[in-house]
Amino acid sequence: MHDNIFLPDAFLAQVQETMPSHLSMDEFIAACKRPLRRSIRVNTLKNSVEEFKQRAAEKQWDLEPVPWCDTGFWITRPESDTVKLGSTAEHMAGLFYIQEASSMMPVTALLKDNDDIEMALDMASAPGSKTTQLAAGMKNQGALVANEFSSSRVKVLCSNIQRCGVSNVALTHFDGRVFGGWLPETFDSILLDAPCSGEGTIRKDPDAMHNWSPESVIEIGDTQRDLIESAFHALKPGGVMVYSTCTLNHEENQNICHHLVEQFGDAVTFKPLGDLFENAEKALTKEGFLHIYPQIFDSEGFFVAKIRKNSSTTPPEVKKRLGKFPFAPASNKEAQAIEAELKSTLQLAIPEDNEFWIRDKEVWAFPKRMKPLIGEMRYHRIGFKLAETHKKGYRWQHEAIMALATADNPTCAELTTEQAREWYMGRDVRPDFSGKGETIVTYKGAVIGLGKWVGNRIKNGLPRELVRDGNLF
């Protein structure tokens, strides 16, 4: 129990005033004091739910389905399992993502009746839980622009995208308010999981409310209004967007959505979410939004609204300042050479939805759907880095292997548990078998990296920033 949890009187008064009458204040406070249940989402870009369930059963992990996400589960592990969930082999291989259950709901809402997305935007995407969930829902097809304003969070976003084998994402690093003017009516689907006061996160962080004040809520609301306007301008007519927060007050939730109607009138339609999952009506507002108080589903507090854009809007005028784009498309000859080498050395091929772009000695695989947006905005990175050229051919990259390879590849080398630990510590390994050339390294049927045979050992190709120490699986 989080008995020492800090709940300001002004916050409790606000909840008392706005919480539906059928919900109990005592139950709300009791729920806030209960530790949050641990939850994960299976990454279907790497394994199916059934395959993951088998792995979990072997490890005696108990999985309870999250009602609003087909790939989400609350997880309970044996007390004897002392390895941190993030240090398990399954997590490091990208087979699952540690994600709070409520935060899976926005992407579920965005994908409902919307399974043919060509161009999507995740406007505030770090650390990457919803970006990777959306990419999996898109099956790595189309294009997904993942934006993050915070410099310190871009690195972890990039790391999670690579770990999960996402290949259709372009990363940007801007204040989300620029999208409406820079890329007007460009995206058919937009997720705006807005920065907020975090009132719903108190079960995870007992100190979450120490910096809370009614004044800070109003200030954050001003930013949210700007962001939702920008998102709506960036949305194509006929497109849908989801606005979500992990907070509970109306100022940052219902009022922000109503502001959109005040600004754009009949161009806005709220899409009711009462049938999103079984018992969703328990959290349904009169507008059709989902306002999740922590006691309803024993989860974090959350808010989700789905909005359709019915007609065109006039975007703000902007002056773009863009430097020269440093990449050029690979020529047909270059592309054929890259494909042939990738096939002959690693028995791999680039997905049809990607194409080669060159920067100096680097070869990248961009989502084809990104091509119309090149030159319209600056990008932190697009797609994934496939290789670096050298005198004898190509030096394939770890992130490309994580995006392209599967454990049934004929070049795979399967490691033992001890060898896999050594691998993640950045050391070369010496299996009791031999091979030649570059090899895809696997552990328990999951790809974990790329190595190269040197005599009877596999030279470790794990990027330095991924090297781990301590208590691993």
From Swiss-Prot:
Major site of localization recorded for this protein: cytoplasm
Swiss-Prot/TrEMBL catalytic activity: cytidine(1407) in 16S rRNA + S-adenosyl-L-methionine = 5-methylcytidine(1407) in 16S rRNA + S-adenosyl-L-homocysteine + H(+)
EC identifiers of the protein: 2.1.1.178
GO molecular function, one term: rRNA (cytosine-C5-)-methyltransferase activity
GO cellular component labels: cytoplasm
Pfam families: Methyltr_RsmB-F, Methyltr_RsmF_N, Methyltranf_PUA, YebU_pre-PUA_dom
Record's function text: Specifically methylates the cytosine at position 1407 (m5C1407) of 16S rRNA.
Name of the protein: Ribosomal RNA small subunit methyltransferase F
